[in-house]
């Protein structure tokens, strides 16, 4: 469950390390975002020669949450940290690598590029 002011790790090699959610997209008063949802983020911490610079605003898709995601069989997949992948204007990932596991739910949300780049799909 990501809301405004939540900080997330970045799970791609776009150059950003930490981002802060500044808006949850998808409805005028939508409060929370879960795995597979798109949010607007501001880069709070970045590596020196990366594509993303501190202060830049990007769209991002949430790939891991502490709240987790519930499957139809009743199981819940949770993670230790919240993480997102930065997207460009066409909703394609900016980075060329994805770090850490992602969930199968991203496949339903048309983020096949992220699923194919991820080292592990849960």
Swiss-Prot record:
Gene3D superfamilies the UniProt entry points to: Ribosomal protein L14
Stored SMART domains: Ribosomal_L14
Residues in coiled coil: none
Domain of life: Bacteria
A GO CC term assigned to this protein in UniProt: cytosolic large ribosomal subunit
Sample GO molecular function, one term: large ribosomal subunit rRNA binding
One Pfam family matching this protein: Ribosomal_L14
A GO BP entry: translation
SUPFAM superfamilies assigned: Ribosomal protein L14
InterPro entries recorded: Ribosomal_uL14 (IPR000218), Ribosomal_uL14_bac-type (IPR005745), Ribosomal_uL14_CS (IPR019972), Ribosomal_uL14_sf (IPR036853)
Keyword terms of this UniProt record: Ribonucleoprotein, Ribosomal protein, RNA-binding, rRNA-binding
Assembly, per entry: Part of the 50S ribosomal subunit. Forms a cluster with proteins L3 and L19. In the 70S ribosome, L14 and L19 interact and together make contacts with the 16S rRNA in bridges B5 and B8.
UniProt-listed NCBIfam families: rplN_bact (TIGR01067)
Annotated family: Belongs to the universal ribosomal protein uL14 family.
Stored HAMAP family: Ribosomal_uL14
Function: Binds to 23S rRNA. Forms part of two intersubunit bridges in the 70S ribosome.
Entry protein name: Large ribosomal subunit protein uL14
Organism: Shewanella sediminis (strain HAW-EB3)
Phylogenetic lineage: Bacteria, Pseudomonadati, Pseudomonadota, Gammaproteobacteria, Alteromonadales
